[in-house]
Amino acid sequence: TTANIDIVTKKDEPGIDIIIKPGTKNESVHIPVILSESGLKDMVYNDFYIGEGADVTIVAGCGIHNCGVDTSEHDGIHTFYIGKNAKVKYIEKHYGEGDGAGERILNPTTIVHIEDGGYMEMETTQIKGVDSTVRDTKADLADGATLVIKEKIMTHGRQTAETNFTVELNGVDSSANVISRSVAKGESKQVFNSNICGNNQCYGHTECDAILMDNGHVKAVPSLEANNLDASLVHEAAIGKIAGDQLIKLMTLGLTEAQAEEQIAKTGANEISISATGNGVENVTKSIISAMSTSTGEGVTGFDVKA
């Protein structure tokens, strides 16, 4: 808690309320969660109240370390109430590790309400090691409100990832830009669902760009719904293997074909390299904190370790 930011533990359900006063500028909130016990299933409800005219950065994420045989799961439900002319940058990162047979599951839900003139930019990244994820995002925008979503996902092995975006452009001159970048390696499978509804004079754009490697599988299911004559909605999608000319360029610089493919995959999904030392919960703690150390300004942290 600071002079402008209050973090209050909920009394009726697990989670916290983050209350940011109107006019707050250049401050940040960090909310990392670490699960280190095999078989632990955790659900939290975190609500963010962003006052009128505030300009803040919120950093959240979860790391799971599972060396056992049971499934470890974290489901985080984050709801944002963004006031008039407020600006929020939300950064969310997920990471999993552990040599046990137990699965690592992360199911984030993000609900966003943006009032007149409000702005939110979301950067969501699934780094590695997550066996299964269903990522749901729902948003409604008032007059002049803007939502920008940048999703980055990498799956490998037999992992599965499903992302679902639903955006209601209710206000005059509201706008949304939903961009997904992903890499599917091994036998992994991904599904990208996007639904933008233009209910007023507005602009909506959704884009899926996926790289396939090995026997990866990606399915993109766009949906645009125009309910107003002045709604302008656009969808773009590109799914395929790495282009041969891209490989050749890197191989002429001395990389092997495998090294070139790996480099392109990292660039395509903007993969975060984690090189923390140590083991067990120490390693995953360092990893997720390192991955989340991207914001600037005065900050307040709520840290939750489940062990």
Identify the residue ranges that each predicted region occupies.
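Conserved beta-strand/loop scaffold segments within soluble protein domains that form the structured core
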Residues: T2-E257, K266-A269
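Short amphipathic alpha-helical segments at helix boundaries and their inter-helical linkers
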Residues: D131, E262-G280
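Type III/flagellar secretion export determinants
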Residues: L250, I274-A307
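Short, intrinsically disordered, charge-balanced linker/junction segments flanking boundaries
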Residues: T256-Q259, Q263, T301, V305
